[in-house]
Amino acid sequence: MDIQMFTTLNSTVPTEPVVGPVEPTVPTVPATKETGPSSSAECSTQPAVAEQEDNSLLAQLLKGKITSDDAKLQPPRGPFEYAPMLSEEAQFAIKLAGLLNPNPVTEQDPSTFKPPPKMSNNVRKNINLTPVIENAVPSGFELESPKDQAFDVVHGRLSMGQNQTCYFVTVEEMRRRLQSPEKLNSSSIACNLKRPKLKNGGELMRAQLRDHGIKVQLNAKQKAFPNKVIALVEAEAVHLGLDLGTAVRDDYPVQDIIQEVAHEALADEDADLDALMNDKDFTECMSALESVFTSVVPPITGIEPKPSNNMRLNNGMETFSSASHGLGIVSQRVWLPQLTAIGNGVASELRRLTETPTESKPEELKA
C-alpha cells in the first residue's frame, strides 16, 4: 500500500474523542490490504482537534517508546525475526505504520531486509508480524538453520489463539514432498504450504519450484493418501514431537505401569519370572536400540542430518522420515527412557515381591 496514504491516514485520525456536539459524519474504514479508505472526502470529514502530543500506541511504536509489557514482545532470534509477537492492537499499528522505522527492540531496519533469492512474495508478510520458530527441536539433535535454503515461510497449523507462529520450509523439503514416498500433487503441496486458492495458483507455484530446479510432473498419481501429516511442514512436525516428548517425560505413569505388570506376572502361573527379573539383558537390549536410533538422522528441516555406515538403514529411515514429515524420527526416541525405566522397575518390583514369605503372596496379589 502507498506510504503516503499511510501517513495521511495516520495524521487525520484523532487521538482523543471531541467533547460536545459533533455533526454526524460518515465513518472511515482503516486502510488495510482488504479495505482501503472509501474516499478522500470521507477522511476530510473528521472533526479537528487541538494539537497535542500523540500518545497512541502507533506513536509510541514509531518513537521507540513502546514497552515490553504493552506490546508483549518476545526477544528476537535472528535477522528474519526482527518483528516480535505483538498484541492485535500493536499488529494493526505496525500495518498502519507501514514498517517505515526500525523496530525499537531489535534496532534492525525492515527496509534493509532482503529475503533469499527466489523466495515467495508472501515471506515478508509472514515474517513481519509473526515470529519464525527455529529452535523447537528435541534434545539429542543438532540444530541446522534453514534460513539460507528457505523456500517459503508458513503459518503453523497447530497454533492456538494469538500465539501464532511460523516455520521455514526449505527447498529440499519441497523436493522430499514431491518425490518418494509421498509424491504429492500440486493440490496437496498447496495445502502443505497453506497457499490460498487462486485462478492460476498452481501455475505460479510450479514456476516457483522450477526456479529452484524442482520439476512438478502434471497428472502424476499421488502415492500418499490424504492424512493429517500432509498438512504439517517438517519444522512444525518436529515441534509437535518436542511437545510430545515433554508430555511423556512429565506425565507418563511409569510407576503405575510397573505395579500392574509385576502383579499380573505374579498372578500368571505360566509367566517366566526369571526372564522378567533379568534386567541386565533388558538394559543391554534397550541400549542397543537407542544406539541404532541415534546413529541415523535423515534430512529434516532445522536438524543436522547424520548418516550411518549402513546404507540400507539410512534409506529406510529416510523413507520413514519423509512419510511422517520428520515426526516419526523425533518421536521414536521419546519412549526409550520410559520403556527402559519400566523394564528395570518391573524387575526390581518382582524381586521385592518374590523375596517375601510364600504365605504373604496372596495378600500382595489382593492389594
UniProtKB/Swiss-Prot annotation:
A GO cellular component annotation in the UniProt record: cytoplasm
Cystine connections: none
Polar residues compositional bias, start-end: 36-47
InterPro entries: TF_AP2, TF_AP2_C
Region (H-S-H (helix-span-helix), dimerization): 220-354
One record GO biological process: regulation of cell population proliferation
Keywords assigned by UniProt, alphabetized: Cytoplasm, Developmental protein, DNA-binding, Nucleus, Transcription, Transcription regulation
Coiled coil: none
Chain positions covered by the region annotation Disordered: 29-49
Pfam families: TF_AP-2
MF GO annotations: DNA-binding transcription activator activity, RNA polymerase II-specific; RNA polymerase II transcription regulatory region sequence-specific DNA binding
Localization in the cell: Nucleus; Cytoplasm
Assembly notes: Binds DNA as a dimer.
Protein family per UniProt: Belongs to the AP-2 family.
Cited function: Sequence-specific DNA-binding protein that interacts with enhancer elements to regulate transcription of selected genes. Required for neuroblast and epidermal morphogenesis, perhaps acting in cooperation with transcription factor aptf-4.
Entry protein name: Transcription factor aptf-2
Organism listed in the record: Caenorhabditis elegans
Gene: aptf-2
